[in-house]
Curated annotation (Swiss-Prot):
Gene for this chain: trmA
Pfam families with a match to the protein in the record: tRNA_U5-meth_tr
NCBIfam families according to UniProt: trmA_only (TIGR02143)
The keyword Protease is assigned to this record: no
EC number: 2.1.1.-, 2.1.1.35
Catalytic activity field: uridine(54) in tRNA + S-adenosyl-L-methionine = 5-methyluridine(54) in tRNA + S-adenosyl-L-homocysteine + H(+); uridine(341) in tmRNA + S-adenosyl-L-methionine = 5-methyluridine(341) in tmRNA + S-adenosyl-L-homocysteine + H(+)
Record-annotated active site: C303 (nucleophile), E337 (proton acceptor)
One cellular-component annotation, GO: cytosol
The protein, known as: tRNA/tmRNA (uracil-C(5))-methyltransferase
Family to which this protein belongs: Belongs to the class I-like SAM-binding methyltransferase superfamily. RNA M5U methyltransferase family. TrmA subfamily.
Amino acid sequence: MHFEEKIALNKALFSSLYDKEIQCFKSPLKAYRTRAEFCIYHHENGEISYAMYENKKKIPIKNFEIADEKIQAYMPILLDNLNENLKHKLFGVEFLATKIDLSITLLYHKNIESITQDLQELSKKLNLKLIARSRGKKLVFNGENLKQILNIKNKEIFYEFNNDCFIQPNTTINEKMIEWVIDLLEKEERKDLLELYCGYGNFTIALAKYFNKILATEISKKNIEFALKNCDLNSIKNISFTRLSSEELSQALKKEREFNRLKGIDLDGFNISHVLVDPPRAGLDVSVIELIKKYENIIYISCNPITLRENLEILSQSHEILNLAFFDQFANTSHLECGVHLRLKA
């Protein structure tokens, strides 16, 4: 789907809720995707190829121009080596790239411990962070954590995460989304931030300097570990990360229940002026909307315009939509990322 067509369709989707100017951010058309997942096609001659599904059928592919340049460079090299001695029962390959790093995961329908030596040699030969998975087993060679550097407002922000974390798959657009949020914040009075679905701190770390304090929640223990590490990487001291669901956070804020995970965090000490949410495709459930709608400013990052539209039907009863932005996360597809800025009605 062309960019202009995608924008027109989504403008129409939100037209009854928002009739002001919409900011639109385009993606590069090639080499933008930092995560690429392929199935494996086993040819009759014994060779393998990367493949993708179309109409439930595996279609072999030779290249993938929308993938990050590091992924494109490694694809043929890796395939040649897999064809030598590591293709048996291989059913998938996953690539994850950052500006400065790359990891590759091989998926097998067999006991991977039997090929440990071959995998080790492949990792050394190609200088790769290599992960192998089969049912209930995982082997890691040369580490699995990736380092990333984002350039936000001419400042470098440092991150570390692994393949199990949710990662924005278009680095260029990710930087633009973070800067869009900062542009909004710079025009407003700011106190403390509450962030839900914070992940490994993608937004949190970059926004730390714009608030007195931040309370950030996430249900994944591994994400919280990386978020704390990313605070250290950037010498940030004003963020409190805690592993709570939105329901648990609501109970804690209402003093209905105490949590050991909040030990050392004084919830009464936060003066929250802004809430940031970046939920999964299902959007916000009613309990989360009830939790956040009492706050003056809401910034909502969405990967699903349909569920965003449904949530805004409710939120717009208490809040005014001040800004709406479209981010072309996946160029030439129907997918669109959205950002919304809402303020409590007088």
